[in-house]
Amino acid sequence: SLEMIQKAIGPRDWTALYQQNPVSDDGDYFTRDMIQYFDPADLDYDRLRYYTAWDLAIGQRDRNDYSVGMTVGIDEYDNMFVVDLVRGRYDGFELVEKILDFYEQWRPGIVGIEKSHIEMAIGPFLQKRVAERRLHSAYFKDLKVGRRDKEARARAIQGRMQQGRVFVPEDAAWTSTLVAELLRFPNGVHDDQVD
């Protein structure tokens, strides 16, 4: 199957050969040697503290940006494991359901949502659906991006990656897309996962 081939050849060759999307070994901002991998079967998920962040975009057209939700687990040594990621183009109703489904799956301590006109637009519906789904323990926090550009916002994760403290799963369906976006940052068409 294609999943077996993807595991066998690795993310770099997979994106080049099967997705017609080659990526150089080293990017301008993130380099391939900064990307650490983990085997999800070997991770002790019970010892991690979970956090989720969302970069929102609304619209389903091909030219629209993606909405991205990412859940990370932090271990007792401050290592960060990207345990799950959802990326797609959704309307406002779908987006709210994705946010809440993701919360129910991982039960993060904090769900950060980028403060923007989109967050303000879906906020009342999100609150309504939280009540209807009885997810009262969910803690949502506005992520304020301020006036800093994407490169400035990415510096914290860049430093953590340089220290070898960020890990991505070696075989998740979304790993190759995430790695490709990291290596193209800040010059790629999409940077929603990095953001």
Protein language model regions, located:
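An active-site-proximal beta-strand-loop segment
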Residues: W54-S67
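Mg2+-dependent endonuclease catalytic cores in nucleic-acid-processing enzymes, primarily RNase H-like
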Residues: E3-M4, Q20-D25, Y29, V68, ...
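Low-complexity, glycine/alanine/valine/leucine- and proline-rich hydrophobic stretches
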Residues: T52, I74-D75
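ATPase catalytic-site recognition across NTP-hydrolyzing enzymes
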Residues: S1-L56
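Acidic, Mg2+-coordinating catalytic module of metal-dependent nucleases/exonucleases
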Residues: L182-D195
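Non-catalytic, well-ordered alpha-helical scaffold segments
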Residues: R12, A16, R155, S176, ...
